[in-house]
């Protein structure tokens, strides 16, 4: 009987401890380590948004399709938003695609469609990415285990 009482008391207090735990993901900045370039790299990361053990991740793309350097902090334009399997710029990527929201005439050339942005208008978290481009289009991404929820605001 005493063991049962102790178990109930322990269970009661342990749930209170878990209820007070902080949401640590709010402190994660996925832009950390993105100040990389081919000559000298400071982290070799890109601001990936994805679920743990997901099929793929999602990221803003400042580099060209097919290059390993998907995102570089010093670059001030976005060429698209891409699905990725890449774990490091040195490993490159495979079976990826990118897209770019726009208005007006369709522009397929990634250099011509690149749009300027400011890091002041960018939020990069593991579970959410948002950027407002200088042309006024806002892109938001929230990952799932097999894809991503996208929202474009014009």
Residue ranges and their predicted role:
Residues 4-13:
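Sec-dependent N-terminal signal peptides
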Residues 15-19:
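Sec/Tat signal peptide C-region and signal peptidase I cleavage site
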Residues 20-154:
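Accessory carbohydrate-recognition regions in carbohydrate-active enzymes
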């Amino acid at each position: 009987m005493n063991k049962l009482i102790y178990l109930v008391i322990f269970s009661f207090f342990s749930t209170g401890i878990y209820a007070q735990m902080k949401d640590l993901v709010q402190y994660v900045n996925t832009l950390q380590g993105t100040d990389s370039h081919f000559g000298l790299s400071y982290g070799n990361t890109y601001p990936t948004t994805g679920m743990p053990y997901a099929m793929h991740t999602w990221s803003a793309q400042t580099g060209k399709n097919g290059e390993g350097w998907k995102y570089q902090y010093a670059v001030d334009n976005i060429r698209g938003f891409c699905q990725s399997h890449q774990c490091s710029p040195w490993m490159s990527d495979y079976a990826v695609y990118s897209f770019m929201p726009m208005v007006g005439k369709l522009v397929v050339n990634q250099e011509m469609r690149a749009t300027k942005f400011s890091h002041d208008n960018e939020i990069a978290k593991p579970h959410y990415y948002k950027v407002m481009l200088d042309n006024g289009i806002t892109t938001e991404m929230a990952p799932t285990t097999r894809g991503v929820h996208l929202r474009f605001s014009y």
